[in-house]
Amino acid sequence: MKKSAPLFLGIIFLTLTGVQGVPAIRNGRCSCINTSQGMIHPKSLKDLKQFAPSPSCEKTEIIATMKNGNEACLNPDLPEVKELIKEWEKQVNQKKKQRKGKKYKKTKKVPKVKRSQRPSQKKTT
């Protein structure tokens, strides 16, 4: 009887413990119903998300978030959008390199020498 109590409690614990996590599927359908035909300037972008086809949505989806908060779905087949993605990835990589450089950059402090401590230079004539 003593051995079955911990086993029983273990089984209850395992069945009552909930599994937490982020679902792999977004919301069960495509996020982009219509795509905008207008061109977006790279400087007005805040974020650019690209979603690959999944069981819930057969299309590749590209969602652009502007600095003013508006979101737009872009057509991934347009050459302008492909160029926009390349420029965005280039900007993101450049920002990562800048952060990495600042993170590991060490500055060397050199003490200043006062004029009175400097060795005097003799004039030769």
Swiss-Prot record:
PROSITE patterns: SMALL_CYTOKINES_CXC (PS00471). Pfam families: IL8. The keyword Secreted applies. GO terms for molecular function: chemokine activity; CXCR chemokine receptor binding; CXCR3 chemokine receptor binding. The keyword Protein biosynthesis does not apply. One of its GO terms (biological process) is positive regulation of release of sequestered calcium ion into cytosol. InterPro entries: Chemokine_b/g/d (IPR039809), Chemokine_CXC (IPR001089), Chemokine_CXC_CS (IPR018048), Chemokine_IL8-like_dom (IPR001811), CXC_Chemokine_domain (IPR033899), Interleukin_8-like_sf (IPR036048). SMART domains: SCY (SM00199). Residues 91-125 are annotated as: Disordered. Disulfide bonds join 30-57, 32-73. It is found in: Secreted. Keywords: Cytokine, Disulfide bond, Inflammatory response, Secreted, Signal. One of its GO terms (cellular component) is extracellular space. Residues 1-21 form the signal peptide. Residues 93-125 have a biased composition (Basic residues). Belongs to the intercrine alpha (chemokine CxC) family. Cytokine that affects the growth, movement, or activation state of cells that participate in immune and inflammatory response. Chemotactic for activated T-cells. Binds to CXCR3. This is C-X-C motif chemokine 9. It comes from Bos taurus (Bovine). The gene is CXCL9.
